[in-house]
């Protein structure tokens, strides 16, 4: 029988990495939305299923990436995303990615940012701070399971996601490797 659901392993080590809360006050006062800026320029992935949607915003797209005259995200206004709930899947899924072994991890570049490096008393594990992103990937019920598993001390955690989301996660990195 065919299924549209895939189970992937979750890196417990990654889920326990602490980040400062990604809230407007912290973004404006400290990090300035640095996660939206790539070290080598704008790298916002637009998936095939998203192209028409973002072209309606008047955005230029080339080879599955947003193209900008000033190399900045056109949706970033005053350090915040002006289309937060409607942003591209690649942005929604951040800071998460799949390793080469299909394990969900935190993307390496996020550990170079202030939200990770400069711990405060408000720092929390990434599965709490970026719960919204996890819900965009897996859905609320799966994330509720993740939290239950982590809090109960379970070591080997697997969550289900749609094939569509799985391939979108894979494509996020594939497109970036091609662009480099």
Could you tell me what each predicted segment is?
Residues 1-180:
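Short loop/turn segments that flank or connect secondary-structure elements
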């Amino acid at each position: 029988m065919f299924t549209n659901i895939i189970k992937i392993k979750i890196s417990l080590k990654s889920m326990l990495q602490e980040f400062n809360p990604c809230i407007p006050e912290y973004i404006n006062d400290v990090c300035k939305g640095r996660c939206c800026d790539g070290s080598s320029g704008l790298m916002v992935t637009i998936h095939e299923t998203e192209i028409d949607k973002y072209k309606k915003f008047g955005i230029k797209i080339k080879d599955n990436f947003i193209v900008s005259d000033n190399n900045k995200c056109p949706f970033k206004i005053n350090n915040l995303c002006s289309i937060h709930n409607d942003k591209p899947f690649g942005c929604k899924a951040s800071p998460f990615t799949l390793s080469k072994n299909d394990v969900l991890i935190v993307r390496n570049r996020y550990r170079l940012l202030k939200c990770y490096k400069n711990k405060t008393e408000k720092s929390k594990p990434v599965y709490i701070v970026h719960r919204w992103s996890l819900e965009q990937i897996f859905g609320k019920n799966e994330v509720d399971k993740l939290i239950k598993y982590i809090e109960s001390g379970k070591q080997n955690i697997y969550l289900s996601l749609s094939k569509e989301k799985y391939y979108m996660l894979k494509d996020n990195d594939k497109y970036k490797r091609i662009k480099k």
